[in-house]
């Protein structure tokens, strides 16, 4: 049967019909001798013809040149398709490619060969996101901790100093690990510098912890008690979270003031950070003025995205405040429960000591010990409620205030642009009136002056439009990054919080199961 079949000539210009080869069993038995007698082709012959001809930039079926016999197609059928073939180059170079250094080639090539219905822009957009994620991962290779609070000085001149430790592999820093001492006003000074640089152009600057005059006064003049120790620990944890959020921002991380704060052993004294100073009063006045201006500005919002986001953040702010109040009440409830449990344990122990029945006395003593352990569990859970959940809500209430702040700056930018347009219109109207007036002796000089003013205000209008478009673009990007971080933070904290609850309940079960035999032993 194989002898009767003659292979068609390869130069007849017809594409290979693989349906005619289905019954050719002898094709496969002759491949070994064919391979031995034929030199290897410089180009891979294992590419299917339909894959090559599917692309308009690739060679036509008539241009596919096999070595000696078409049986070589099947002889190499077990080899993998080479993605480095020159015949594949037109497919990959038909469109401009973004920078794909961090991404392996298979992530870009494989989908385009196997799934022709997928459009190239989708692949490139997805690769760009992957590149950005990997780049962000490298940028955020930095760990910051705030520890060792230490009281420096005596009386009202005393202050708390904290050790800020940084571990990083970023080349922008001189060392991979370093630590410095910073006081609370240094943190406030850092935030003030960053806010003055980046807030008005649309960047969300994480807010620093708020001052507490009452709490710090207790630390300065009072003795070390539980309330002052708790206040210092709360502030230490808040400062640590503030720095961690700040260095996560790729733009803020590049700022020289932040690097100086983390590296420099000595910092210039931060000024204008006192709550009751003249600068503090001026800040309160400016906030009140901004609130009044916000009510008077009537912005015609043409972008539905900004209108929707502003409403979303308003609702989110209200719900977070309600939840924060509920969690604060829960923390107080657990502390009260802990105190009542401790009182119950003390009463049970006293009753056990006065009991004459041996088994009952022993059971009451064991019950008192269990209640003391449960009291400790309630205290630990109250701390978990506060440091895990309540502080997260408090941080995001302040962060949403910062988000609202960039929206307000966008409104101010629009108002500045709008004022420039109104002034330009008035200047043009004045020029038109001047042209109508019949005063040739004064018109030329005035015309030149008004023309210079018009050109100046035209430049201001163009600059205002560019500034408004730029801040809108920046805010869109910042809000997207903020939403990702918010979801990630809440997921992490909720999981840790639930794990702490589960651990507490499991420990409670162990305590009561261990006490149960003592109760049953009463006879």
Curated annotation (Swiss-Prot):
Interaction with RhoG, as annotated region: 260-523
Keywords of this entry: Acetylation, Cell projection, Endosome, Lipid-binding, Membrane, Phosphoprotein, Protein transport, Transport
Its job: Involved in several stages of intracellular trafficking. Interacts with membranes containing phosphatidylinositol 3-phosphate (PtdIns(3P)) or phosphatidylinositol 3,5-bisphosphate (PtdIns(3,5)P2). Acts in part as component of the retromer membrane-deforming SNX-BAR subcomplex. The SNX-BAR retromer mediates retrograde transport of cargo proteins from endosomes to the trans-Golgi network (TGN) and is involved in endosome-to-plasma membrane transport for cargo protein recycling.
Species for this entry: Pongo abelii (Sumatran orangutan)
Record-linked Gene3D superfamilies: Arfaptin homology (AH) domain/BAR domain, Phox-like domain
Record PTM N6-acetyllysine, positions in chain: 473
Annotated positions binding a 1,2-diacyl-sn-glycero-3-phospho-(1D-myo-inositol-3-phosphate): 183, 185, 211, 235
GO molecular function terms listed in the Swiss-Prot or TrEMBL record: epidermal growth factor receptor binding; insulin receptor binding; leptin receptor binding; phosphatidylinositol binding; protein heterodimerization activity; protein homodimerization activity; transferrin receptor binding
The BAR domain, residue ranges: 299-523
Recorded topology in the membrane: Peripheral membrane protein
PROSITE patterns, alphabetized: PX
Residues modified as Phosphothreonine: 101, 104
Name this protein carries in UniProt: Sorting nexin-2
Domain notes: The BAR domain is able to sense membrane curvature upon dimerization. Membrane remodeling seems to implicate insertion of a N-terminal amphipathic helix (AH) in the membrane.
């Amino acid at each position: 049967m194989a002898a009767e079949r003659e292979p068609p000539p390869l130069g007849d210009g017809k594409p290979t019909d693989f349906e005619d080869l289905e019954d050719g069993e002898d094709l496969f038995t002759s491949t070994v001798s064919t391979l031995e007698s034929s030199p290897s082709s410089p180009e891979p012959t294992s590419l299917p013809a339909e894959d090559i001809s599917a692309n308009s930039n690739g060679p036509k079926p008539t241009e596919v040149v096999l070595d000696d016999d078409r049986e070589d197609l099947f002889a190499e059928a077990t080899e993998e398709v080479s993605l480095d073939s020159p015949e594949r180059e037109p497919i990959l170079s038909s469109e401009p490619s973004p920078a794909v250094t961090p991404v392996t080639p298979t992530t870009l090539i494989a989908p385009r060969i196997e799934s022709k219905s997928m459009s190239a822009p989708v692949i490139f957009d997805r690769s760009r996101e992957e590149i950005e994620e990997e780049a962000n991962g490298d940028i955020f290779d930095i760990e910051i901790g705030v520890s060792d609070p230490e009281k420096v000085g005596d009386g009202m001149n005393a202050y708390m100093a904290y050790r800020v430790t940084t571990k990083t592999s970023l080349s922008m820093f001189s060392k991979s690990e370093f630590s410095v001492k910073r006081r609370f006003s240094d943190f406030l000074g850092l935030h003030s510098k960053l806010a003055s640089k980046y807030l008005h152009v649309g960047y969300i600057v994480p807010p620093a912890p708020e001052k507490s005059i009452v709490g710090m006064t207790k630390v300065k003049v009072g003795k070390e008690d539980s309330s002052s120790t708790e206040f210092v620990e709360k502030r230490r944890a808040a400062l640590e979270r503030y720095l961690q959020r700040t260095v996560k921002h790729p733009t803020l991380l590049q700022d020289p003031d932040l690097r100086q704060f983390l590296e420099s052993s000595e910092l210039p004294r931060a000024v204008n950070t006192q709550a009751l100073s003249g600068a503090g009063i001026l800040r309160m006045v400016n906030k009140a003025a901004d609130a009044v201006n916000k009510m008077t500005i009537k912005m015609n919002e043409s972008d539905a995205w900004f209108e929707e986001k502003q409403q979303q953040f308003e609702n989110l702010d209200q719900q977070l405040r309600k939840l924060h109040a509920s969690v604060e009440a829960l923390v107080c409830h657990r502390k009260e429960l802990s105190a009542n449990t401790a009182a119950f344990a003390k009463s049970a122990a006293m009753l056990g000591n006065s009991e004459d029945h041996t088994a009952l006395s022993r059971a009451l003593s064991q019950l008192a010990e269990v209640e003391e352990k449960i009291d400790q569990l309630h205290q630990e859970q109250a701390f978990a409620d506060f440091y895990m959940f309540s502080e997260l809500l408090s941080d995001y209430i302040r962060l949403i205030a910062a988000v609202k702040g960039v929206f307000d700056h966008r409104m101010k930018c629009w108002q500045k642009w709008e004022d420039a347009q109104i002034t330009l219109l008035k200047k043009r109207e004045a020029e038109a009136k001047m042209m109508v007036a019949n005063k040739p002796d004064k018109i030329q000089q005035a015309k030149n002056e008004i023309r210079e003013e018009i050109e100046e205000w035209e430049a201001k209008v163009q600059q205002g439009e560019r500034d408004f478009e730029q801040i809108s673009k920046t805010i869109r990007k910042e809000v997207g990054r903020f939403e990702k971080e918010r979801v990630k933070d809440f997921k992490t904290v909720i999981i840790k919080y639930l794990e702490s609850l589960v651990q507490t309940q499991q420990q409670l079960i162990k305590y009561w199961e261990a006490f149960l035999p003592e109760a049953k032993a009463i006879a």
